UniProtKB/Swiss-Prot annotation:
GO terms for biological process: methylation; tRNA processing. Its EC number is 2.1.1.-, 2.1.1.35. This is tRNA/tmRNA (uracil-C(5))-methyltransferase. One of its GO terms (molecular function) is rRNA binding. S-adenosyl-L-methionine binds at residues 180, 209, 214, 230, 290. It catalyses: uridine(54) in tRNA + S-adenosyl-L-methionine = 5-methyluridine(54) in tRNA + S-adenosyl-L-homocysteine + H(+); uridine(341) in tmRNA + S-adenosyl-L-methionine = 5-methyluridine(341) in tmRNA + S-adenosyl-L-homocysteine + H(+). The gene is trmA. InterPro entries: MeTrfase_TrmA_AS, SAM-dependent_MTases_sf, TrmA_MeTrfase, U5_MeTrfase_fam. It comes from Campylobacter jejuni subsp. jejuni serotype O:6 (strain 81116 / NCTC 11828). Belongs to the class I-like SAM-binding methyltransferase superfamily. RNA M5U methyltransferase family. TrmA subfamily.
Length: 357
């Protein structure tokens, strides 16, 4: 979430100075700061296409003024994206069928792989052979989308390996999953949580908003059992696959919203999706939440404040502060970390560790 409504905070030092004041009612100790490299840190990039005089350009449009900016290079994008951009553009410019009614492209990369998604305002079935040729000639994992249609060439799944405390964690996911877009910072966030857990008495872990298991797989060895919830069926399927990739057997995944989980734990409602999971068998010492920008609603806060330790990963300092007003009635902030996810922008990721008073 952007801090631009509060001022022009771009550097990590400026963000740190603001956050210290903004959260002073909850935390007065030293913040842990995690910097990112300045260039080629972002693994996801989305661009528009601009058509002029029968040729094609990458472009971005100002969301307020709608002013057009021709893009030739993205210094914040992963090196694999930067290297592939001119190759793709040259190929598209030479194929009129691929170029016609093409309006956008999405790049996604991991340490090992790259995929692209081309977005069209026309029936992509009509250019299926052209798209297949593009994928084969440029040796690229390609997805094409138009209204109600999706075509995949080679594969849409990407493999990722994260290095966490001398361990390698293996993942597979696709473009539809929520992905931390700065791999270096993602590794630092997970490592920060692991270092806290190293000092803790631990039983079982409850994780909400687990996605494809980004935190889950790395944290599982610290606990006897893990219950991780997520509403996306696709994410759950990837999470189960990632358990197999890492030979992890102590994680139980449930496709539930946080509100549904709250009802289930309070025994106010039974869910068929929990038929193979006995909630009474868990003894949660820690809960991890990584919510969307809207933060936690009251039902989730009421649920998690029952547990001894809370790890809160936030992409929105504004909703984090609102949630801490409630959580501070039962818990104390023990650690506060700032992760410069998007360098030289007003955006900031926060990590907070709370323990029961």
């Amino acid at each position: 979430m952007s801090l631009e409504n509060f001022g022009n905070f771009l550097t990590l030092d400026e963000k740190h100075s603001f956050i210290k004041k903004y959260f002073k009612e909850f935390y007065t100790k030293d913040f842990k700061l995690f910097a990112s490299k300045d260039k080629h840190y972002r693994t996801r990039a989305e661009l528009s296409f601009y058509h002029e005089n029968d040729t094609l350009f990458y472009a971005m449009f100002d969301p307020k003024s709608k002013k057009k900016y021709i893009i030739e290079y993205l210094d914040f994008a992963d090196e694999k994206i930067c290297a592939f951009m001119p190759k793709l553009l040259e190929y598209l410019r030479q194929d009129n069928k691929l170029k016609e009614k093409l309006f956008g492209v999405e790049f996604l990369t991991t340490k090992q792989e790259l995929s692209i998604t081309l977005l069209y305002h026309k029936n992509i079935e009509d250019i299926k052979s052209n798209l297949e040729n593009l994928s084969n000639i440029l040796h690229i994992n390609l997805i094409a989308r138009s209204k109600g249609k999706k075509l995949i060439f080679k594969t849409e799944n990407l493999r990722q390996t994260l290095n966490i405390q001398d361990r390698k964690i293996f993942y597979e996911f696709n473009n539809d999953c929520f992905i931390q877009p700065n791999t270096t910072i993602n590794e630092k966030m997970i490592t920060w949580v692991c270092e806290i857990l190293n000092t803790q008495k631990r039983m079982d872990l409850l994780e909400l908003y687990c996605g494809y298991g980004n935190f889950t797989l790395a944290l599982a060895p610290f606990f006897f059992k893990v219950l991780a919830t997520e509403i996306s069926k696709s994410n759950i399927n990837f999470a189960l696959k990632n358990c197999k990739l890492n030979n992890t057997t102590n994680i139980h995944f449930a496709r539930l919203s946080s509100e549904e989980l709250s009802l289930a734990i309070k025994k106010e409602r039974e869910f068929f999706r929990l038929k193979d999971i006995r909630l009474d068998d868990f003894n949660f010492s820690h809960v991890l939440v990584d919510p969307p920008r809207a933060g936690l609603d009251k039902s989730v806060i009421d649920l998690i404040k029952k547990y001894e330790n809370i790890i809160y990963i936030s992409c929105n300092p504004i909703t984090l502060k609102e949630n801490l007003k409630e959580l501070s009635l039962t818990h104390r902030v023990e650690e506060f970390a700032l992760f410069d996810q998007f360098v030289n922008t007003p955006h900031l990721e926060c990590g907070v560790f709370l323990s029961k008073v």
